[in-house]
Regions:
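NAD-dependent ADP-ribosyltransferases
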Residues: 1-156
Length: 156
């Protein structure tokens, strides 16, 4: 795997917010009842949707088609859209109807992924992103995410 995403964080002076060895703290991911009914993994690239009466929710990652294969684009920025899968360092209380899952601190991060810390608040949940380091087939991205999924536990 390349070090391109690491260099982006290093050049921006944000290397302290880039992790590719171990999960830096307990992270939480909410799963909606709809996602659960569909049997979707907890960590998966949401394709986006348009909630009734609200602006569209963009896809988690950019997916392009190359020779008939769906390819996830590797993250190359510290901010913006299509960076990866959202997680938080605490549950978000106003997200009703979600079941929360915890990814424990010190869980090894698969070699094709990085976790980035996108905010640094003391008084509210901080956003973290599970990002693809490089372009890869969508199916392979899910394999790497599944390596983290197996460490998730349902939070009480």
């Amino acid at each position: 795997m390349s070090e391109a995403l690491r260099r982006v964080y290093e050049e921006a002076g944000l290397l302290k917010y880039y992790f590719d060895k171990d999960v830096p703290c307990d992270l939480f991911r909410g799963q909606s009842a709809t996602e659960a009914k569909k049997g979707l993994p907890i960590l998966y690239p949401n394709p986006g949707f348009t909630p009734k009466g609200k602006p569209p929710r963009l896809p988690d990652v950019e997916i392009v088609e190359v020779n008939g294969k769906k390819i996830v684009k590797g993250c190359r920025t510290t901010r913006g859209d299509y960076r990866g899968i959202s997680t938080f360092d605490r549950k978000i209380p106003n997200l009703g109807g979600f079941t929360w899952y915890q990814l424990p601190k010190a869980t090894p991060i698969p070699e094709a992924l990085a976790i980035t810390q996108d905010s640094d608040y003391a008084d509210r949940p901080n956003h973290f992103t599970v990002a693809p380091k490089d372009d890869m087939p969508l199916e392979l991205f899910q394999v790497w995410l599944d390596a983290l999924n197996k460490h998730l536990t349902k939070d009480a």
